[in-house]
C-alpha cells in the first residue's frame, strides 16, 4: 500500500504547485 501513499503525496505536491502558480499569476483559466 506504499504506492497509494506515494500517489497521494505526488497529487498533493502537484495541487500545491498548481495553486501557487494560479494565485501568483492573473487568472487565465478560461479560454
UniProtKB/Swiss-Prot annotation:
Give residue numbers for the modification (N-formylmethionine).
1
| UniProt cross-references to SUPFAM superfamilies, sorted A to Z | Photosystem II reaction center protein T, PsbT (SSF161029)
Pfam families with a match to the protein in the record: PsbT (PF01405)
Q: What happens when the gene is disrupted?
A: Decreased photoautotrophic growth. Decreased assembly of PSII monomers and dimers, increased levels of the CP43-less intermediate, plus an altered dimeric form. Double psbM-psbT mutants do not assemble PSII dimers. Cells are light sensitive and rapidly photoinactivated; recovery requires protein synthesis and light.
GO CC, sorted alphabetically, is:
photosystem II reaction center; plasma membrane-derived thylakoid membrane; plasma membrane-derived thylakoid photosystem II
Q: Which compartment or compartments is the protein found in?
A: Cellular thylakoid membrane
| Membrane topology per record | Single-pass membrane protein
- InterPro entries from the xrefs? PSII_PsbT, PSII_PsbT_sf
The UniProt keywords, alphabetically, are: Formylation, Membrane, Photosynthesis, Photosystem II, Thylakoid, Transmembrane, Transmembrane helix
The membrane spanning regions, by residue number, are 3-23
Gene Ontology biological process terms, A to Z: photosynthesis
* Described function: Found at the monomer-monomer interface of the photosystem II (PS II) dimer, plays a role in assembly and dimerization of PSII. PSII is a light-driven water plastoquinone oxidoreductase, using light energy to abstract electrons from H(2)O, generating a proton gradient subsequently used for ATP formation.
Subunit composition?
PSII is composed of 1 copy each of membrane proteins PsbA, PsbB, PsbC, PsbD, PsbE, PsbF, PsbH, PsbI, PsbJ, PsbK, PsbL, PsbM, PsbT, PsbX, PsbY, PsbZ, Psb30/Ycf12, peripheral proteins PsbO, CyanoQ (PsbQ), PsbU, PsbV and a large number of cofactors. It forms dimeric complexes.
Please give the HAMAP family that the UniProt record associates with this protein.
PSII_PsbT (MF_00808)
Q: Which family does it belong to?
A: Belongs to the PsbT family.
Q: What is this protein called?
A: Photosystem II reaction center protein T
What is the organism of origin for this protein? Synechocystis sp. (strain ATCC 27184 / PCC 6803 / Kazusa)
Amino acid at each position: 500500500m506504499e504506492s497509494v501513499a506515494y500517489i497521494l503525496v505526488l497529487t498533493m505536491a502537484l495541487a500545491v504547485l498548481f495553486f501557487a502558480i494560479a494565485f501568483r499569476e492573473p487568472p487565465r483559466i478560461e479560454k
